[in-house]
């Protein structure tokens, strides 16, 4: 995107941008409310795999954010849609904490547990946290050896919670894929199809959009490759000088976004 152009719409990450753990980032509610009142379209694009779209929308709405489920694209929702379309009727072994299984059930995906019959032909791993026990990982490993496909909702290395930076599922997914000698299909960020899905939903060309995120690798870089403006915020994951150089714009937090937009429109 030409840096002189003001974006007409925004894709916005959730964790590290709107909230850290359960704590709402100061000014985030006001920023989204300002976008809504100004008639500027936005969608929330998140690798959250713990919540279904409906439950995440409810949590954010309870915190004061002016959002509904239709405003949100989660890695879990996108993965459920992909499995339903590409592997119709194939049993799926899902490793993911929370209620994201609701999106799989809604999409018509048949989920089986470690003692399920028939054996799963697809292994899906999300933000599994306490689900990532040795026994469950080993079961997934054996399924992969038997020919099951491996799908990652995302491959994030870490994320920020109320307790601080926390190890995510990415390293475990890499390990199990290496052990089984299989390839990983990643659905969520930074995969281009995930971004394109949100672009189609917002009904604007990618070149007229901006991505607001706290992760230079998973948020900013893929968005900029599609022609968007990358807006990196310092409110979540640690941001290096190199990260700031790669992003077209760097802000302290999303609270600064309305002022940045207003300044751009006056240029």
Residue map of PLM features:
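Asp-based, Mg2+/Mn2+-dependent phosphohydrolase catalytic module
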Residues: 2-40, 49-73, 80-267
């Amino acid at each position: 995107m030409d840096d002189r152009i003001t974006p007409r719409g925004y894709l916005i990450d959730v964790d590290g941008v709107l909230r850290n753990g359960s704590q709402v980032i100061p000014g985030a509610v006001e920023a989204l409310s300002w976008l809504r009142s100004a008639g500027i379209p936005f969608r929330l694009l998140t690798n959250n795999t713990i919540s279904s779209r409906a439950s995440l929308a409810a949590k954010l709405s309870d915190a004061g954010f002016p959002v509904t489920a239709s405003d949100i694209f989660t890695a879990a929702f996108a993965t459920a849609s992909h499995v339903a379309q590409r592997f119709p009727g194939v049993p799926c072994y899902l490793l993911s904490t929370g209620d994201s299984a609701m999106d799989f059930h809604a999409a018509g995906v048949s989920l089986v547990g470690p003692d399920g019959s028939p054996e799963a032909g697809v292994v899906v791993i999300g933000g599994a946290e306490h689900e990532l026990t040795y026994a469950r990982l080993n079961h997934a490993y054996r399924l992969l050896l038997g020919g099951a496909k491996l799908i990652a909702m995302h491959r994030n290395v870490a994320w920020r919670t109320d307790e601080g930076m926390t190890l995510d599922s990415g390293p475990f997914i890499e390990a199990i894929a290496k052990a089984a000698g299989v390839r990983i299909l990643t659905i969520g960020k930074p995969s281009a199809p995930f971004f394109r899905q949100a672009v189609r939903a917002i009904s604007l060309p990618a070149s007229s959009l901006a991505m607001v995120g706290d992760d230079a690798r998973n948020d900013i870089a893929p968005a900029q490759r599609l022609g968007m403006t990358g807006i990196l915020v310092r409110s979540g994951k640690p941001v290096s000088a190199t990260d700031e150089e790669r992003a077209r714009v760097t802000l302290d937090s999303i609270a600064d976004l309305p002022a940045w937009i207003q300044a751009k429109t006056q240029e």
